[in-house]
């Protein structure tokens, strides 16, 4: 049933060799270092760290969530489409509220946000002694506008490896 060396169907010759090699490569692929992903809401702790360390917010800073935030010409939604209403930064963090983190990310600003990413080692490979480590896929700082920063603040529009995020 689950034998990676056996094919489910009959092929022959070069196709068989290629398919077998593809299966072996897939079986031995280390997704923790070879693949990147958007960290999503788990990344909000990084944005929170940047905001708190730069004194941009306190735990009691007040925000409002109507279920979305308009950034430039884009409507970016919260997972709670009816909104969380009035909330503090601490409550917004507990609610994993995208509009709160959009506001916070924009207050932190691009330069400080990238400085925090660099400080945490998220802009370069870890240097782990395992072959095939992928690197961060992220906008160049000069190309980051409000929309990009807004979505990055809650872990979208860039990619890192799981090992980088440890």
Regions found by a protein language model. Name each.
Residues 1-41, 46-166:
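Beta-lactam-recognizing serine transpeptidase/beta-lactamase-like catalytic domain environment
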